[in-house]
Amino acid sequence: MDLKFTVSGRIAKSVDVVYEAVADPAQLSKYFTTGGAKGRIETGATVTWDFHDFPGAFPVRILAVEKNRRIELRWGAAPGTADADESGEPSTKVTLEFEQLDDGRTLVKISEEGWAQRPEGLAASYKNCEGWTGMLCAMKAWLEYGVQFRQGFYK
C-alpha cells in the first residue's frame, strides 16, 4: 500500500483569487510561509519556502502548473522518510488542485505522495498531512477574513 494522503477544503473566493494566494510569494507569506516565500510558482521554477517554526528554508521545485487548476511540486524530506527522487535525494510530490464551484467558492485539494514504506515515512506523512490541513485553514482565514493565525500555531 502506498503512503499518500489528500486533504481538501472550500474557500469562499473565486478560483483565480485562491490560486493567486498560493502562486504569489507575497500572499503565501501572509498565511503559510511564516519566514517568507521567494519566487513565483511557475513551471520549472525552484522557489524557497521558509517557516519560523521549522528549521531553515526549503527549496521547492515546481514540476507543472495549470493556472487556476493545478500546481505540482516536489520538495525534500528527511532521510529515511521518503523515496529518492531523480537526484537521489529523499523527496515527496505534492499536487494542489483548484476547482471553481457553482456557488462561487473554490474547492482546494492537496495530495502528497512518495513516503517510504516504513514507520518513519508513516510518521512524516502524518505530520505533513497536519501541516497541509493547517495551510488550508490558514488560507481560508486569510482570504475570507483577513486573519493571520499560523504565526505561533506550531511552536
Give the label of every model feature segment.
Residues 69-77:
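Short, solvent-exposed secondary-structure boundary/capping segments
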Residues 1-15:
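Terminal, regulation- and interaction-focused segments at domain boundaries
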